[in-house]
């Protein structure tokens, strides 16, 4: 904030010495100076009223008429104005929208956007009472941003009339400064408190506000300066001998802190002070300048980056943590949270630092409370809050209420509810004095366990189709408490019986856990009984359970017990081995069946190939049948340019063309088609081949080249059509479309740019629709050198802010779905999943602004009907793809090394063509007989499809008789 009026002329010179500022920072500085001038007049007027005419206003550069300018400025800034509508229809429309928003909030009170829209409309309509209530309701649920608080404060200041209203505004300021660290709100608070200096205790109130503001944001490198100067401005306006020392003290405190514009502050102090500046102050000032140089790189990184600047703040936090100043660490965390309030990990790190280092009750609990208000969907924040309240001795009733709020927070996973219940049950267990046989706390703990099991079964299973606790961890903990702390093994056994009936009886580790509990707190009889049941039920590791049973009987059992145990284990293991053998035989049969099918397919392909070869020999004039027609995957309706229409008419003479009619569809309409004679077609194909020279791939240009695929095969002149698209990314050197031997476009090409940044920008055009198909754009990579290189632009892990929607009608458009999703939050991105032909698959991914909106959307949209289709909505969490195992070679008996058949990450592909040499696929056969002599080894009989059967003398005789 600016200095006194007489030093305002030196501001430009001081500003030139300041550190670098971004454009936004310069605007803030200008705004701060404007507020400082208003503050000067407000301070002068208030001091005049307090001290009377004895104070010389002209000496301080303030006129008497400026006394009420602060109130006028505040009113002009914040007054919403009187909106006059030209049409009553618009006002009625706003009223209907207000009613709709109120109804929506009655259904879902956690809809942040609805609160904001309702406040905006009520303020627009001038409903001051209703807008105040709406703001209060929102502030109880969510922390408000600096803009929302300033708007609310300005409205309340403009309506304040007397001292009672001023106290109400003070209370509002106190709430505002608790949500986030806001230098502008503290500045407004100080300015407003100056206006009440004439009231009883007004002077002490102003100083208290400014001192608290300095404690909160006085260390702020870029915005703390305004508060220091505002405080000095206030003290300088009160001309008393005792106050001069106060101004000296403020100057010395400020100069000892590394802040921007320190040189200007030092120059101002030299000009203001009549005495020489003490040496200790100069030393502290020089030390602060040195510290400023260390902080400048981090501050400059923040100024140059764009919000939310999480990475820059993380680096700044790490730097402050190394230095270890608690005040500065707290400040940088608060600054980071202003822009990253929806990042749970940042809240967790901040609260963890406070829990372990500062341990100040009010500060710790305040941060935990703000954390759950900002990220209510994060169960870790709620669990940490319960622990912090217990750690600082908060009343049990308050902790219970907080836990009930956590259950209504809307967690996005079933396991989150298990975690919060476990945290609360741990707290209740620590309250119980188990030395007493019965107590109120113990009964409350047992009731909580019972309620937890019912809640997971009814509420959680109904919502997520799973309890979130398949291993029954809560019941296991309850059983341990009953057995170890309450000496109630009967209850523990009942709980374990219930655990086993929930699908856990087949797991050896569950039985061994129960056995260990019986071993520690039960008796041998129940241990033996548990192991006998385990032997009969376990299916994953029966050998281990059998070994434990035999070990127990060996050390504690009688001969009869030993015989029974041996008999049961042998019977069980024999049955298990029999089942395993049957399963292995079944699997081997399936493998053999697959191999037989593969052999049949192979034989059929060989027969087909031999037949084509025979036809080719018989009719050399016909077109080669072994040329494959390239068919687009998933696009059965698109006609390929390589296909020829059969024409029943005779072939015209050479050099002529004939106009024939070809049936165009079931309607019976015919279309005239010009058919060229074969000679011209051959000439045209030959010319196409001559016009398309082969270009060797230059791997040195891979960085400036992109590979474009999935283009329509029917695309005419790909270069002409694709060049305008890619020239938007930068200068295109050439486009190399790939054609077949017949001159047909094969659906992919290479685009070479002049600069590498253009190629990187072109990758953003991936999935862009071209002639109705999604165009794939990927980096140009030599697959022979990088066989594992894959490009997938979307995340394959859990994304809590993104939804996966299935069951959509194929006719649903992106705009229609976006309109539905917008009702539940801000949609950042929406993607309809299509196949290669561009046709929808009934799936979509919707990305929301934060996890809270996504969680609410799941609850509201799951099971919704869209165009008679019931959709399913869930948090995006794609299943893990199977990673192919590393191939290993195996050697066939008496043959060469064999390579096992391997598949990609998605399993078998559509094209089951083996690209391995035949010599590696089966035992090598002897080479066929050479042209000039016999082979080195006897030939192995080839399949019947590829070699004619051997004929006897009788067969040859029959052939001669036929003639």
From Swiss-Prot:
Segments for region (Necessary and sufficient for U6 snRNA binding): 537-953
Domain of life: Eukaryota
Composition bias type Acidic residues, residue spans: 57-69, 626-639
Keywords: Acetylation, Coiled coil, Cytoplasm, Methylation, mRNA processing, mRNA splicing, Nucleus, Phosphoprotein, Repeat, RNA-binding
Positions of post-translational Omega-N-methylarginine modification: 906
Disulfide bonds: none
Tissue and organ expression note: Ubiquitously expressed.
Principal location listed in the UniProt entry: nucleus
Mediates interaction with PRPF3: annotated segments: 2-351
Region spans: Required for interaction with USP4: 487-520
PROSITE patterns linked to this entry: RRM
Subunit and partners: Component of the 7SK snRNP complex at least composed of P-TEFb (composed of CDK9 and CCNT1/cyclin-T1), HEXIM1, HEXIM2, BCDIN3, SART3 proteins and 7SK and U6 snRNAs. Interacts with AGO1 and AGO2. Interacts with PRPF3 and USP4; the interaction with PRPF3 is direct and recruits USP4 to its substrate PRPF3. Interacts with USP15; the interaction is direct. Interacts with HIV-1 Tat.
Function statement: U6 snRNP-binding protein that functions as a recycling factor of the splicing machinery. Promotes the initial reassembly of U4 and U6 snRNPs following their ejection from the spliceosome during its maturation. Also binds U6atac snRNPs and may function as a recycling factor for U4atac/U6atac spliceosomal snRNP, an initial step in the assembly of U12-type spliceosomal complex. The U12-type spliceosomal complex plays a role in the splicing of introns with non-canonical splice sites. May also function as a substrate-targeting factor for deubiquitinases like USP4 and USP15. Regulates Tat transactivation activity through direct interaction. May be a cellular factor for HIV-1 gene expression and viral replication.
Protein name (Swiss-Prot/TrEMBL): Spliceosome associated factor 3, U4/U6 recycling protein
Organism from which the protein derives: Homo sapiens (Human)
Organism placement in taxonomy: Eukaryota, Metazoa, Chordata, Craniata, Vertebrata
Gene: SART3
């Amino acid at each position: 904030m600016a200095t006194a009026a007489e030093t305002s002329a030196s501001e430009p010179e001081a500003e030139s010495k300041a550190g670098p500022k971004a454009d936004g920072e310069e605007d803030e500085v200008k705004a701060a100076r404007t507020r400082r001038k208003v503050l000067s007049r407000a301070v002068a007027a208030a001091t005049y009223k307090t001290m009377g005419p004895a104070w010389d206003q002209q000496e301080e550069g303030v006129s008497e008429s400026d006394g009420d300018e602060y109130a006028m400025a505040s009113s002009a800034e914040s007054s919403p104005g009187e909106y006059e509508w030209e049409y009553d229809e618009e006002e009625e429309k706003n009223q209907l929208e207000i009613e709709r928003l109120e109804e929506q909030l009655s259904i879902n009170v956690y809809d942040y956007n609805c609160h904001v829209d309702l406040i905006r409309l009520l303020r627009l309509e001038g409903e001051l009472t209703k807008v105040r209530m709406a703001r209060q309701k929102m502030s109880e649920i969510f922390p408000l941003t600096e803009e929302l608080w300033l708007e609310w404060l300005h409205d309340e200041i403009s309506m304040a009339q007397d001292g009672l209203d001023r106290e109400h505004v003070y209370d509002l300021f106190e709430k505002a400064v608790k949500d986030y660290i806001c230098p502008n709100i503290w500045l407004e608070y100080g300015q407003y408190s100056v206006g009440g200096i004439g009231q009883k205790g007004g002077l002490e109130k102003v100083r208290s506000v400014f001192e608290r503001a300095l404690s909160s944001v006085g260390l702020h490198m870029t915005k703390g300066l305004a508060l220091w100067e505002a405080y000095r401005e206030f003290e300088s306006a009160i001309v008393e001998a005792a106050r001069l020392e106060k101004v000296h003290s403020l100057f010395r405190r400020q100069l000892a802190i590394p802040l921007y514009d320190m040189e200007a502050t030092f120059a101002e102090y030299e000009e203001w002070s009549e005495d020489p500046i003490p040496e200790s102050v100069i030393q502290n000032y020089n030390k602060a300048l040195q510290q400023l140089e260390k902080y400048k790189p981090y501050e400059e990184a923040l100024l140059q980056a764009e919000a939310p600047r999480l990475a820059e703040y993380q680096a700044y936090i790490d730097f402050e943590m190394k230095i270890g100043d608690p005040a500065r660490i707290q400040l940088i965390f608060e600054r980071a949270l202003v822009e990253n309030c929806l990042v749970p990990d940042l809240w967790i790190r901040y609260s963890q630092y406070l829990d372990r280092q500062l341990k100040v009750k009010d500060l710790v609990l305040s941060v935990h409370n703000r954390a759950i208000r900002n990220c209510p969907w994060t169960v870790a924040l709620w669990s940490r809050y319960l622990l912090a309240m217990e750690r600082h001795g908060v009343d049990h009733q308050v902790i219970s209420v907080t836990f009930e709020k956590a259950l209504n927070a809307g967690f996005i996973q079933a396991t989150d509810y298990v975690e919060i219940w476990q945290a609360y049950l741990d707290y209740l267990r620590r309250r119980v004095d188990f030395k007493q046989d019965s107590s109120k706390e113990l009964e409350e703990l047992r009731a909580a366990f019972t309620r937890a099991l019912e809640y997971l079964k009814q509420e959680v299973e109904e919502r997520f189709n799973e309890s979130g606790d398949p291993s029954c961890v809560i019941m296991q903990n309850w059983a341990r408490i009953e057995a170890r702390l309450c000496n109630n093994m009967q209850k523990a056994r009942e709980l374990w019986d219930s655990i086993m009936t929930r699908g856990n009886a087949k797991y050896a580790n569950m039985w061994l856990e129960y056995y260990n509990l019986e071993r520690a707190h039960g008796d041998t009889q129940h241990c033996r009984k548990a192991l006998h049941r385990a032997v009969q039920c376990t299916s994953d590791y029966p050998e281990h359970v059998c070994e434990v049973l035999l070990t127990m009987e060996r050390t504690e059992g009688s001969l009869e017990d030993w015989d029974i145990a041996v008999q049961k284990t042998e019977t069980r293991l024999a049955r298990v081995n029999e089942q395993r053998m049957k399963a292995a035989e079944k699997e081997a049969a399936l493998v053999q069946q697959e191999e037989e099918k593969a052999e049949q397919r192979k034989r059929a392909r060989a027969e087909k190939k031999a037949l084509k070869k025979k036809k080719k020999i018989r009719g050399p004039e016909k077109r080669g049948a072994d040329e494959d027609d390239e068919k687009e995957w998933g696009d059965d309706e698109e006609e390929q340019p390589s296909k020829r229409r059969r024409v029943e008419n005779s072939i015209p003479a050479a050099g002529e063309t004939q106009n024939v009619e070809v049936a165009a569809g079931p309607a019976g309409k015919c279309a005239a088609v010009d058919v060229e004679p074969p000679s011209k077609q051959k000439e045209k194909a030959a010319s196409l081949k001559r016009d398309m020279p082969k270009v060797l791939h230059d791997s040195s240009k891979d960085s400036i080249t992109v590979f474009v695929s999935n283009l329509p095969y029917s695309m005419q002149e790909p270069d002409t059509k694709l060049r305008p698209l890619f020239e938007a990314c930068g200068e295109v050197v050439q486009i190399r479309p790939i054609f077949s031997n017949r001159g047909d476009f094969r659906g992919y090409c290479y685009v070479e740019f002049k600069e590498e940044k253009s190629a990187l920008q072109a990758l953003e055009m991936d999935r862009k629709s071209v002639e109705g198909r999604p165009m794939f754009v990927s980096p140009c990579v030599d697959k022979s050198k990088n066989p594992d290189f894959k490009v997938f632009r979307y995340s394959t892990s859990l994304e809590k802010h993104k939804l996966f929607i299935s069951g959509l009608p194929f006719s649903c458009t992106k705009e229609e779905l976006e309109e539905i999703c917008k009702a539940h939050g801000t949609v950042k991105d929406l993607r309809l999943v299509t196949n290669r032909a561009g046709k929808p698959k009934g799936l979509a991914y919707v990305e929301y602004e934060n996890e809270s909106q996504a969680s609410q959307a799941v609850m509201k949209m799951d099971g919704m009907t869209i165009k008679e289709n019931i959709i399913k909505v869930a948090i995006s969490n794609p299943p893990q793809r199977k990673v192919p195992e590393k191939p290993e070679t195996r050697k066939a008996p008496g043959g060469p090394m064999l390579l096992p058949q391997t598949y990609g990450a998605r399993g078998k592909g559509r094209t089951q063509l083996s690209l391995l040499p035949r010599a590696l696929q089966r035992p090598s056969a002897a080479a066929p007989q050479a042209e000039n002599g016999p082979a080195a080894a006897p030939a192995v009989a080839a399949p019947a499809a590829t070699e004619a059967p051997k004929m006897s003398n009788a067969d040859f005789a029959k052939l001669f008789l036929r003639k």
